């Protein structure tokens, strides 16, 4: 009996991938991101296994082997992604060794133990509304 091409491992390299829905890619929040923020979002999304949303990290130990050298670039890109509503901080990081945890804004929250965020207040799709919120310093001129 022949093997189905759809289930064939020859169809693609590797068995893991980053799922970035078109609704996210086409959103104004994603489109407004700079190149560094988009790249960082993909590198953080790479950690998602299907059961760990809410426990993704953006620490130096994880990002340095992926080519992220500048702490300033990572900080600015991370702030940009969080402001866009694409990444939600679920646990605040603390020195000396407690990493901040994040959740991808287009997936439901999987991890609820050990997070600082109330799981009842977490909503997917916050990136859809983030583009509607004016930036700080926006004038109310007519």
Where is each model-derived feature located?
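Winged helix-turn-helix DNA-binding recognition segment
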Residues: 36, 47-108
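Short recognition helix of helix-turn-helix/winged-helix DNA-binding domains
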Residues: 1-61, 65, 109, 113, ...
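Generic signature of intrinsically disordered, low-complexity, basic-rich segments
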Residues: 33, 73, 80, 126-127, ...
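Electrostatic interaction modules used in gene-expression and signaling proteins
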Residues: 87-103, 110-115, 128-142
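A recognition module on extended beta-rich or small alphabeta surfaces enriched in W/G with H and D/E
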Residues: 120-126
